Swiss-Prot record:
The keyword rRNA processing does not apply. SUPFAM superfamilies: Translational machinery components. GO terms for molecular function: 5S rRNA binding; structural constituent of ribosome. Belongs to the universal ribosomal protein uL18 family. Part of the 50S ribosomal subunit; part of the 5S rRNA/L5/L18/L25 subcomplex. Contacts the 5S and 23S rRNAs. One of its GO terms (cellular component) is cytosolic large ribosomal subunit. Keywords: Ribonucleoprotein, Ribosomal protein, RNA-binding, rRNA-binding. This is Large ribosomal subunit protein uL18. This is one of the proteins that bind and probably mediate the attachment of the 5S RNA into the large ribosomal subunit, where it forms part of the central protuberance. It comes from the Bacteria. Pfam families: Ribosomal_L18p.
């Protein structure tokens, strides 16, 4: 089993838990990480629609390192606060909560999002 297969299995398990326990219909932040960039989408599963998104490509950042991931987190937080969505559920996309994923979460928390 490859590393990517393991990540997909983890992600299915995470999504299943989120859908079962998200009884308040909070917005879900889904993180997509590639080797060079990082992006995040804010999903509302009750309406099945993406509310807003942000990425290192959209912000025209050179790479997806920790500092830029923190900026992406701050950007998505400001967009969600404008939409009056402060309480969210964080979905790591099957990746471990470490490095760029953790930096993105710290940036979002610094701007006022509650996980």
């Amino acid at each position: 089993m490859t590393r990517n297969d393991k990540r997909r299995i983890r992600h299915k398990r995470i999504v299943k838990k989120i859908r079962l326990t998200n009884l308040n219909n909070r917005v879900v932040l889904i993180v997509i990480k590639s080797l060079k960039n990082i992006s995040v989408q804010a999903w509302d599963f009750s309406k099945n629609v993406v509310l807003t998104s942000s990425s290192s490509l959209q912000l025209k950042l050179k790479n997806g390192n920790k500092e830029n991931a923190k900026l992406v987190g701050m950007d998505i937080a400001t967009k969600l606060i404008k939409l009056n969505q402060k309480d969210v559920v964080f979905d790591t996309g099957g990746s471990k909560y470490h490095g760029r994923i953790a930096a993105l979460a710290e940036g979002a928390r610094a701007k006022g999002l509650n996980f």
